[in-house]
Amino acid sequence: MAGLVKGGLGSASLDLGGGLMVGALAAVNPVGSVHMPDGETFWAWPFEIDGEFGGRRPGADLVLAREPLPEQSRLKAERRLEPGANTTLCVVAVSADLTSAECKRVAMMAQDGLARAVRPAHTPFDGDVVFALTGGGVALGQDERPLHVAQLGSACADVLARAIARGVYSAT
């Protein structure tokens, strides 16, 4: 389950050019919702590529999300509001030669993708986590290395948001 809809396993990737690739895999089962208040548009819609999770966009009549945890009574009835009942487990991968500290930074940045795709994320009822790994391959060099790591982390956040939406879209 993802909120009140069926969860699933999703993946996404992005070619950054020059041999640099980022990818994400997500097992999606959060207590939070992946949909906007209309129940159809994914929170991750701004990051969608080529209609990969339905191509739905918010309409002009979209009601603003004012309720931080909608459908509480239904979530309680389905026993979703219990510690350990939900989680979103994620891994992001990059094809660059990152150090352990840089992988940690990329994982920290990729957490933003989870928060972009699920509302709310990281609740006391979730065990949300993001791991990062590197396949080596592309040498970043030392010139502007922090900038490259920041770009990779940002791209990982975007692909993770897509992977989460794809997991739910393919399951429903």
What function would you assign to each model-found segment?
Residues 1-172:
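A structural signal for small-residue-enriched, beta-sheet-centric alpha/beta enzyme cores
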